[in-house]
């Protein structure tokens, strides 16, 4: 089976995009690139720089100056899927803090900010052999990607997953607060997180990560069969 050179996975927060992306990339031997961590890293820097997240000019200037690196987890044994450095500082787990969650959509919605980030994301995607996870990857960043997945789940399922994730790390999490934050973020992101017209939509409620991966692998196999028939 020959997998597509670029696979994009979009969807709302808590749908399981990062888990699917990491498992799929490992299965295929591809690079896993969660583009959302770039926006979270920027939001973290906005908070620590005491910058108004509504100030598009200031946030854009910060985005241009930041050194954001997304690296393999290395020897870390804390369950992380990747390591995120901002100007050399490991902020991986801080990016899931509720304060970051509350402003990430505000900082990311500035058009100039998204332009800066998309250019960086597109450069990585153009190398091929990559699974890219985000909200607008298939529709805007990599519109010519040969396989696009839109992963979704109910708001209750997504909030439960995010709560469980925080609790597993020993943090404090309030299910209702997380649910409300997700609803608010969905409203802010509704213009950038719509699925691409040619995306394959998967609803992950009640499915294990392995079951979702199996659905995507089946989709890849179907594409390969269609391609072989077209060449015959």
From Swiss-Prot:
Gene Ontology CC entries for this record: cytoplasm
Domain of life: Bacteria
Catalysis performed (reactions): CMP + ATP = CDP + ADP; dCMP + ATP = dCDP + ADP
Primary localization class, coarse: cytoplasm
InterPro entries: Cytidylate_kin, Cytidylate_kinase_dom, P-loop_NTPase
Enzyme Commission identifier(s): 2.7.4.25
Pfam families documented for this protein: Cytidylate_kin (PF02224)
This protein's name: Cytidylate kinase
Species of origin: Roseiflexus castenholzii (strain DSM 13941 / HLO8)
Lineage, highest ranks first: Bacteria, Bacillati, Chloroflexota, Chloroflexia, Chloroflexales
